[in-house]
Amino acid sequence: MARIAGVDLPREKRIEVALTYIYGIGRSTARRVIRETGVDPDTRVRDLAEGEIAALRRYIDENLKVEGDLKREVNQNIRRLMDIGCYRGLRHRRGLPVRGQRTKTNARQRKGPRPAIGGRKK
């Protein structure tokens, strides 16, 4: 099993799909990595040579921010918004939608479950 950026890639999948298991690499980035390293995109992970795995690992380490580094940067950006007190930071702090969505109805994903209100007796 190939291990790149701290992630075990599934052996049976094509390398293009397997690279998307790494946080921060989607389909287009995976295609770019494969093109730059010269690996055949139809190759299964189990069929990769050790040199190809090393080339992929080297390219990802040198050129991309993935996994823990990327998660840390995203969290720092959100924390910075909250510290400077801008509108987006306030929305993050209050747990409300940040990008202008309505909140009169919906927005349950960000707001959490509705508070229980007791039924009225007649």
From Swiss-Prot:
PANTHER family noted in UniProt: 30S RIBOSOMAL PROTEIN S13/40S RIBOSOMAL PROTEIN S18, SMALL RIBOSOMAL SUBUNIT PROTEIN US13M
Function: Located at the top of the head of the 30S subunit, it contacts several helices of the 16S rRNA. In the 70S ribosome it contacts the 23S rRNA (bridge B1a) and protein L5 of the 50S subunit (bridge B1b), connecting the 2 subunits; these bridges are implicated in subunit movement. Contacts the tRNAs in the A and P-sites.
The protein, known as: Small ribosomal subunit protein uS13
Residue ranges, annotated region (Disordered): 94-122
UniProt keyword tRNA-binding present: yes
NCBIfam families from the UniProt entry: uS13_bact
UniProt similarity note: Belongs to the universal ribosomal protein uS13 family.
Record's keyword annotation contains tRNA-binding: yes
GO cellular component, one term: cytosol
